[in-house]
Swiss-Prot record:
This protein's GO CC annotations: cytoplasm; cytosol; endoplasmic reticulum membrane; Golgi apparatus; nucleus
Name of the protein described by the UniProt record: Ubiquitin-like modifier-activating enzyme 5
Chain positions covered by the region annotation Disordered: 306-337
Biological role stated in the UniProt entry: E1-like enzyme which specifically catalyzes the first step in ufmylation. Activates UFM1 by first adenylating its C-terminal glycine residue with ATP, and thereafter linking this residue to the side chain of a cysteine residue in E1, yielding a UFM1-E1 thioester and free AMP. Activates UFM1 via a trans-binding mechanism, in which UFM1 interacts with distinct sites in both subunits of the UBA5 homodimer. Trans-binding also promotes stabilization of the UBA5 homodimer, and enhances ATP-binding. Transfer of UFM1 from UBA5 to the E2-like enzyme UFC1 also takes place using a trans mechanism.
PANTHER family named in the record: UBIQUITIN-ACTIVATING ENZYME E1, UBIQUITIN-LIKE MODIFIER-ACTIVATING ENZYME 5
Residue sites binding Zn(2+) per the record: 224, 227, 301, 306
Region (Linker), start-end ranges: 346-376
Motif range (UFM1-interacting sequence (UIS)): 333-345
Motif UFC1-binding sequence (UFC), residue numbers: 388-403
Source taxonomy: Eukaryota, Metazoa, Chordata, Craniata, Vertebrata
Length: 403
């Protein structure tokens, strides 16, 4: 019995050593990816450079400094259909650090969502995602948290990590992405970001899986999630009471991919400062419709921190430098009905026009003719008229057939 226990303890020690070696290999970048960590991005066009196509954006003038992407940290809450694909795209883009939050496990029912694989069923989503993402790009730093952010004991830790979990410990993350599938979690993220003044982006897919949206939330500047909440939130309805037994929401990998794509595109434009960042961008798969809009914050928002952020933004706005534009001199309008100064030139001279005109009638003073009747040409051919014979069309046709 003692020997069996000793063998088991020895085996446990061997496994712990193997686990430590595996962790060391992952940190060093010698894991499953087959390459070491790249210290600096290069634009060298070779097959062995994973960043050559990304750095081409700089060479083509789209982005001024693509290397800056490695200095940013992004937190993703919800590693499901949209969140996992979002994390994969940012990993492939070479983001500096990703913080992943989710409490769910991978199920076979998730296999239609593009990212997870069948052998990962039963694993926590954050662990499965980290394992796959680290093998894709070992240059990215990962921090995973397997818990529900809406619970009291975990909400404070969630706030601590987004305010101190940046690329450098103690610095806030640069952006928080909401990829959750319920309003309770969205409200928790909204509350945390309003309190911290943290910019975040929200995303979602409709229950029938044929539409979705993304929304940028800048505390104080744009509407937060509580400024114009959905009916289920405004009515304080428990979401659990709305779900029927045996009925689940639809899920299309195409819609998930589109929403994740436009979300990451907006993230890249926001971080790397190129193009126009959308405050709201919708997607309707039925009509291929992409509506955009900007929503102002609600001065009577239920979230007190949102109202506080609005007041602080109003104080900051006058101090922000405004882009001065040189005054443009307005060109004098030649004629109110002809602002372009277009002139119509006749191909006929005044003398020719006078000679070809007919007699001008005598008119009272102040009245002129718009045009004159042209003279009848003397060499014009007179019209030839034929007298009506009185025969019908049928008779004429019969006579023609006899000829």
């Amino acid at each position: 019995m003692a020997e069996s226990v000793e063998r088991l303890l020895q085996r446990v020690e061997e496994l712990e050593q193997e686990l430590a070696r595996e962790r060391s290999r992952r940190i060093a970048g010698d894991g499953h990816c087959g390459r070491t960590r790249i210290q600096k991005m290069s634009d060298e066009v070779v097959d062995s450079n994973p960043y050559s196509r990304l750095m081409a954006l700089k060479r083509m003038g789209v982005v001024s400094d693509y290397e800056k992407i490695r200095t940013y940290a992004v937190a993703i809450v919800g590693v499901g259909g949209v969140g996992s694909v979002t994390a994969e795209m940012l990993t492939r883009c070479g983001i500096g650090k990703l913080l992943l939050f989710d409490y769910d496990k991978v199920e076979l029912a998730n296999m239609n969502r593009l990212f997870f694989q069948p052998y990962q069923a039963g694993m926590s989503k954050v662990q499965a995602a980290e394992h796959t993402l680290r093998s894709i790009n070992p240059d990215v730093l990962f921090e995973v948290h397997n818990y529900n952010i809406t619970t009291v004991e975990h909400f404070e830790h969630f706030m601590n990590r987004i305010s101190n979990g940046g690329l450098e410990e103690g610095q806030p993350v640069d952006l928080v992405l909401s990829c959750v599938d319920n309003f309770e979690a969205r409200m928790a993220i909204n509350t945390a970001c309003n309190e911290l003044g943290q910019t975040w982006m929200e995303s979602g897919v409709s229950e029938n899986a044929v539409s979705g949206h993304i929304q940028l939330m800048v505390p104080g500047e744009s509407a937060c999630f509580a400024c114009a909440p959905p009916l289920v939130v405004a009515s304080n309805i428990d979401e659990k009471t709305l779900k029927r037994e045996g009925v689940c929401a639809a899920s299309l990998p195409t819609t998930m991919g589109v929403v994740a794509g436009i979300l990451v595109q907006n993230v890249l434009k926001f971080l790397l400062k190129f193009g126009t960042v959308s405050f709201y961008l919708g997607y309707n798969a039925m009509q291929d419709f992409f509506p955009t809009m900007f929503m102002k914050p609600n001065p009577q928002c239920d979230d007190k921190n949102c109202r506080k952020q609005q007041e602080e933004y109003k104080k900051r706005a006058p101090a922000q430098p405004t882009q001065e534009t040189a005054p443009q001199e307005e060109e004098e309008v030649v004629h109110e009905d002809n602002e372009w100064g277009i002139e119509l030139v006749s191909e006929v001279s005044e003398e020719e026009l006078k000679n070809s005109s007919g007699p001008v009638p005598t008119l009272p003073e102040g009245i002129t003719v718009a045009y004159t009747v042209p003279k009848k040409r003397e060499d014009s051919v007179s019209e030839v008229t034929v007298e009506d014979s009185g025969e019908s069309l049928e008779d004429l046709m019969a006579r023609m057939k006899k000829m």
